[in-house]
Amino acid sequence: MKRDLSLAGTAEEILRRSSDIIFSMIKDIAMKEPSPVEQTGEVTVFKRRRPEDGNLAPLKTTAEAYDYIRMLQAEGYPRAFVETDELRFEFEDAEVADDGVIAKVKIRNKFTKL
């Protein structure tokens, strides 16, 4: 049983859409009791993300930065960031613009409070 899922928007938006699909599938499974079908194809294994995986510094394109920012915007996920020696810049609400990406940024001092 497969359903299409749009990957547009933030991680939070994608998770909401996927939950709607999952609940619909649960209802179908309970009512129709389909026969299991063995999966085919190559197995893909993903490593668990760590907070430091959200660092934008190694990225090369604005498209990569946009995807990082939007995919790390969900409850429980640390935001995409860039750091200097003293400051941490955390990004959210990314939008593609004509000449790059526009996003909200929260700037934190890494070692002291305001």
Label for each model-derived stretch:
Residues 1-112:
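Active-site-proximal loop/hinge segments within enzyme catalytic domains
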